[in-house]
Amino acid sequence: MEYIIKSILEDIINNVIMSSKIIGVHINREKTLKKTIEKLYKYGGNALQIFTSNPSNCSPANLDKYIKEYESIKDLQCNFVIHASYTINIGSLDPKQMKLNMNTITTDLIIANKYKAIGVILHVGKYVKNKPEDCIKQMKVFMLEIIEFIKDNNLNTKIILETGAGQGTEMIVDIDDFNNFTKDFDKKYFGVCFDSCHVWSAGFDIIEAYNKLKQNIIVIHFNGSKTPKGSLKDRHEQLFCDTNTIPIDKLTTFAKNLKNVMIILETPNEDEYAKEIDYLRCV
């Protein structure tokens, strides 16, 4: 029985590896990263998005732990991307907070380099109670410092900025503003993460917005949206359910346009991952 299960798992893994599409999920971590990757294989995925530390605070990851754990997974076929903590605000004007943010993100970049990950994803900054123009300037300075860190340390990974939903005081939510903010960054060290839920919630057509940004897009967060277009809410939804407000035919057309990018599902129900990954492979 154990041999049969092992054989089935090996067949799944081989089929996933042979696929030319890089598709995966952000799933809750198992006890070990190796077990998490094995779970990913069962869903039919070959890409994994992870947090390296608690996403609800800005504390840097345990670098030594991740360097050691790499030895247990280095022979497995898996494409990684790291998502930085949700609480990091790269538009903050607080020097102490910015220093902590820098430490946390540079640690993630070192881990990303070790794991041969495509990069580290950041959310756009928030101005909170400050002047938006001051915070946008600071956000630009921060991004350039991160790019300089990657360059100076010869890291083979990128810093990736994710499109915003417009929730709260998020900045550069408008697609043209986002494009203008990012267009001059060195593409050797920088890329864009396009989130279909965020863009829809921000009030934009996902296909039109994608076409404006596609030259810099290296990761897609392929999500449905629980809230209507233009709601300015970050509420992800499964792809195939009545409460997804993005029409499935639009998502299908969008998926057909995606070439040479990593696609990550952040939909809320793990029971649907196998079905959703299969859908993305077949379109």
Positions of PLM-derived features:
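Gly/Pro-rich active-site loop or hairpin
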Residues: 92-95, 171-179, 198-262
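Active-site beta-loop-alpha junctions enriched in small/polar residues
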Residues: 26-30, 53-55, 85-87, 125-127, ...
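Aromatic/hydrophobic pocket-lining residues that form the small-molecule binding cavity
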Residues: 33, 66, 70, 101, ...
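Hydrophobic faces of well-ordered beta-strands that scaffold small-molecule active sites
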Residues: 23-27, 48-50, 80-84, 120-122, ...
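Acidic (Asp/Glu)-rich catalytic clusters
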Residues: 39-44, 64-81, 108-114, 148-154, ...
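N-terminal pre-domain/capping segments
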Residues: 12-84, 92-107
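Active-site acidic/histidine proton-transfer and metal-coordination neighborhood
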Residues: 75-76, 90-191, 201
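C-terminal helical cap(s) of enzyme catalytic domains, especially alpha/beta-barrels
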Residues: 273-283
